[in-house]
Amino acid sequence: MKIEKIVAREILDSRGNPTVEVDVVLESGIMGRASVPSGASTGEHEALELRDGDKQRYGGKGVQKAVDNVNKIIAPKLIGMSSLNQRGIDYAMLALDGTKTKSNLGANAILGVSLAVAKAAASYLDLPLYRYIGGTNTYVMPVPMMNIINGGSHSDAPIAFQEFMIRPVGAPSFREGLRMGAEVFHALKKVLKDRGLSTAVGDEGGFAPNLEGTEDALNSIIAAIKAAGYEPGKDVMIGMDCASSEFYHDGIYDYTKFEGAKGKKRTAEEQIDYLEELINKFPIDSIEDGMSENDWEGWKKLTERIGDRCQLVGDDLFVTNVDFLAMGIEKGCANSILIKVNQIGSLTETLNAIEMAHRHGYTTVTSHRSGETEDATIADIAVATNSGQIKTGSLSRSDRMAKYNQLLRIEEELGDLAVYGYKRIK
């Protein structure tokens, strides 16, 4: 079970940008392979993704430095260590880096090794990855949060909010939830086509049509849910990612950044009123980053106002980091945390954040990034931690389907023991 070889390489992600892939080979010849995702809209407190900055190569986005850090600095340190010592390996890499944001070696270097080690160890023990990470009490299949309309930084549509998601909460199983989501996705395509709108898909496989605004997007989704034969608010709920840090400046939520002259400028109080108005009008039960990552007071007020009837997910606010999550718990900000492995940069720290959240009654949403690969590790992490929710894009693009298909396999393997997540978190 000892590590014999670690090899990193530069590969391309779903956006055609370079990312890091790592192979960890054990003495027995068993290998674990992992590749690292990357985000388009990133929280300012995220762990650092090391890019080369050489404009002559991939427009400066190369990751050869991170690859070299794995091959020349991390590998010599870890070779000979037991692959079963995940915490020891992760903390050895953190010590080797020596910074809070992993800016020396790069979170993309450390994470690639961390995930590949876990995969190698699981293979060595002949266990599925979710079982190795989570132990014997892993049984909750996540409710998918499917991003079917893109706005904000993920599209050219004049809508400030970044994602409009469907949550098939009324399904009896993950398999059926996935089917419901796919049917709504195809119904939405027809709704948009009938209006002469674009059905081209964005980074995460959702549509990015030139809609009139937020309410138009929500009404289009409701029309699609009904057209697919489901009841909005019962079978399928709606979730939104406002990504409001992207349009927050000097205490003002400035919608004109994405919506042009039609967009409003709102104070924190007005932003809270607006979000409350939307959840009263539409079947929305989850809002991510409704307030800016730096507006802690706004977050507290939003949580006091609607936290009892809506899941309020902190993404940029918490960046999968226990220090920021602890602050949020203490101040009463949000009631849920988005979990992105590359925001923090190691498996151990990811699991620490999930454990802290669950211990304090916060829900967790395991999440992809907009730049993904065929690596489906987050599907296993969602089940391993009984997260109950996963956000991994729309119902198109193989980089998104890889995660959904892995969840289908896991549910099949769990058989009658599998519980579809929403029953647990409602």
UniProtKB/Swiss-Prot annotation:
Query: What EC number is given for this enzyme?
Result: 4.2.1.11
Enumerate the residues binding (2R)-2-phosphoglycerate. Q162, K340, R369, S370, K391
Swiss-Prot/TrEMBL keywords: Cytoplasm, Glycolysis, Lyase, Magnesium, Metal-binding, Secreted
Cofactor(s) needed by this chain? Mg(2+)
Please share the entry's free-text remark on the cofactor.
Answer: Binds a second Mg(2+) ion via substrate during catalysis.
Which GO terms of the cellular component aspect does the record hold? Answer: cell surface; extracellular region; phosphopyruvate hydratase complex
The residues that hold Mg(2+) are D241, E288, D315
Q: In which pathway does it act?
A: Carbohydrate degradation; glycolysis; pyruvate from D-glyceraldehyde 3-phosphate: step 4/5
- Which enzyme type, at the first EC level? lyase
Database matches in InterPro entries: Enolase, Enolase-like_C_sf, Enolase-like_N, Enolase_C, Enolase_CS, Enolase_N
| Functional summary from the UniProt entry | Catalyzes the reversible conversion of 2-phosphoglycerate (2-PG) into phosphoenolpyruvate (PEP). It is essential for the degradation of carbohydrates via glycolysis.
**Protein name per the record:** Enolase
Q: Which organism is it from?
A: Bacteroides thetaiotaomicron (strain ATCC 29148 / DSM 2079 / JCM 5827 / CCUG 10774 / NCTC 10582 / VPI-5482 / E50)
The gene it comes from is: eno
